[in-house]
Amino acid sequence: LLSALSAGPVGIGDRIGHTDATIVMRTCDADGGLRHVDRPAALVDDCLFGAPARGERLAWATATATRAGEVWTYVVAINVSTRRVHIHDSLALHDLGLEGPRSVLDWRGGTTIIDDRLSGSLAPRDWAYFVVAPLGRLADDGDLRKYVTMPSDLP
């Protein structure tokens, strides 16, 4: 997932004969072309000074993909606590520069809701992944088998 949100190459590090093709295909189209974002994922400002490592909040990172002039936002939340504690946390879409409620896909859960914040309750080393649609669009548009459901059409 993080490689797919890196806006760069995706390297497969599995041993020969042990690659899970289903996971690899989440990063690319059938022809092998990567489904890329505009820029690499980056932590939100409030996560830059150690709060996730201290177990005070989840590590939230975002990337965007611009397609046909619309901006799709991809958000990953990871529990990186060094104390290995369960963390309940939320992130307002306003903190990402997104105004008002949006259609949000919980990619792992396969559910779509309309909300103005993302929430996660994660065990140590667990992760959540969300797709936030542009205003007026549904987050479950696109290819839901892929990490980048609506890839960028920017060069």
PLM features: residue spans?
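Active-site-proximal substrate-binding groove within the catalytic cores of carbohydrate-active enzymes
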Residues: 1-138
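Accessory, solvent-exposed terminal regions and/or long lumenal/extracellular loops of proteins
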Residues: 134-155
